[in-house]
From Swiss-Prot:
It catalyses: L-citrulline + L-aspartate + ATP = 2-(N(omega)-L-arginino)succinate + AMP + diphosphate + H(+). Pathway: Amino-acid biosynthesis; L-arginine biosynthesis; L-arginine from L-ornithine and carbamoyl phosphate: step 2/3. The gene is argG. L-aspartate binds at residues 124, 128-129. GO terms for biological process: argininosuccinate metabolic process; L-arginine biosynthetic process; urea cycle. Its EC number is 6.3.4.5. PANTHER family: ARGININOSUCCINATE SYNTHASE (PTHR11587:SF2). L-citrulline binds at residues 92, 97, 128, 132, 183, 192, 268, 280. This is Argininosuccinate synthase. GO terms for cellular component: cytoplasm. Pfam families: Arginosuc_syn_C (PF20979), Arginosuc_synth (PF00764). SUPFAM superfamilies: Adenine nucleotide alpha hydrolases-like, Argininosuccinate synthetase, C-terminal domain. It is found in: Cytoplasm.
Length: 410
């Protein structure tokens, strides 16, 4: 342990009440001899959080923070990301990545309120979350001390963690099969599972891994129709009923999950260099992404839409890698938000056996002109003869290139 960390007096621990952070809590007390403040964020993970309070109290914690951050999470983090249609490596909707900036922000704020001189997270030394948390800490308080137990202790596996917990009589949660659980991350946007039988990417994930969606094959035989209303790029209503951001995403999760939507078995490239396999469920987010892209399809100019599509992978990578608080992410966000000024209207979708299909879209700011696109008489809205000059000018460079090539062949 370095001298810079020996003098820690009080630390704010991002605490879920699960195996890892409960072991970390006890380890901090034993190793650092410091006061521990626990912070548990309700991001819509769908589990009772009072057990986390009771476990922290059992371990002697005096200052316990449990906060409902669901509305802030969706309003200030999920929705801005969805304005960008952000998807990492073509498929991942960034459910874990987008939660870390908010948790880091509140840890730093609580540290300031309580006079803590350090923060601590439970991320492993192999994963992305250690980077995401610590980049957030650095951006929000570069002077704060950071404790990353997985990079310090000799508990190098989940088996050793369980042994430590049993030795110190720390209760261990079991899954519905009576086993120690997968490594799970959950919030209102998604739930993910890693580890155990999922570590071999050649093996199909067993059905018991899934918890937020039915098997597409078992979904209702009758499709569900839903209309999502948008204002300036953000979803604001379902079937005409205005809802808060968190309430709306909760409802989309229910509708999507009931129809088997949002399942993903993914091998991704971690920022730290290795590949990892995880199983994700993002039912509401999947529906929301399809709806938002459909809303943009009639309200965004072609040039703006194509530029957004070009920038999206970079934006998604910034979030995945933990650079939410970076100036480049904020610059891109300003551009994206500007593009959303007219993204207002409604999208109708059919949810059926794992698919969310757009069946209608409308907007008071639509750029779709039936008068121009019709196959019937357009009453002079578009002169098809104009296309000849348009094509001739666009073909000029190709004709010049062909002429040069023909000359050089002789």
């Amino acid at each position: 342990m370095s001298g810079a960390t020996k003098d820690v007096k009080k630390v704010v621990l991002a605490y879920s009440g699960g195996l890892d952070t409960s072991v970390i809590l006890k380890w901090l007390q034993e190793t650092y001899g410091c006061e521990v403040v626990t912070f548990t964020a309700d991001l819509g993970q769908g589990e009772e959080l009072e057990p986390a309070r009771k476990k922290a109290e059992m371990l002697g914690v005096k200052e316990i923070y449990i906060e409902d951050l669901r509305e802030e999470f969706v309003r200030d983090f999920v929705f801005p990301m969805f304005r960008a249609n952000a998807v990492y490596e073509g498929v991942y909707l960034l459910g874990t990545s987008i939660a870390r900036p908010l948790i880091a922000k509140r840890q730093i704020e609580i540290a300031r309120q309580t006079g803590a001189d350090a923060v601590c997270h439970g991320s492993t030394g192999k994963g992305n979350d250690q980077v995401r948390f610590e980049l957030g800490y650095a951006a929000l308080n570069p002077e704060i001390k950071i404790i990353a137990p997985w990079r310090e202790w000799d508990l190098t596996s989940r088996t050793k963690l369980i042994e430590f917990a049993e030795k110190h009589q720390i209760p261990i949660a079991k899954d519905k099969r009576g086993e120690a659980p997968f490594s799970v991350d959950a919030n209102l946007l998604h739930i993910s599972a890693e580890g155990k039988v999922l570590e071999d990417p050649a093996d199909e994930a067993p059905e018991y891994v899934y918890s937020r969606s039915v098997r597409p094959e078992d979904a209702p035989d009758t499709p569900t129709y839903v209309e999502v209303g948008f204002e300036k790029g953000d979803a604001v209503s379902i079937d005409g009923v205005k809802m808060s951001p968190a309430t709306l995403l909760t409802k989309l999760n229910e509708l999507g999950g009931a129809n088997g939507i949002g399942r993903l078995d993914l091998v991704e490239n971690r920022f730290v260099g290795m590949k990892s396999r995880g199983v994700y469920e993002t039912p509401g987010g999947t529906v929301l992404l399809v709806a938002h892209r459909a809303m943009e399809s009639i309200t965004l100019d072609r040039g703006a839409a194509h530029l957004k599509d070009e920038l999206m992978p970079r934006y998604a990578e910034l979030i995945y890698n933990g650079f939410w608080w970076s100036p480049e992410r904020e610059m891109l966000q300003a551009l994206i938000d500007k593009s959303q000024e007219m993204v207002t209207g409604s999208v109708r979708l059919k949810l059926y056996k794992g698919m969310a299909t757009v069946v209608g879209r409308s907007s008071p700011y639509s750029l779709y002109s039936m008068a121009h696109v019709t196959f019937e008489e357009d009453a002079g809205a578009y002169d098809q003869k104009d296309a000849a000059g348009f094509i001739r000018l666009n073909a000029l460079r190709l004709r010049l290139l062909a002429a040069r090539n023909n000359r050089t062949k002789k």
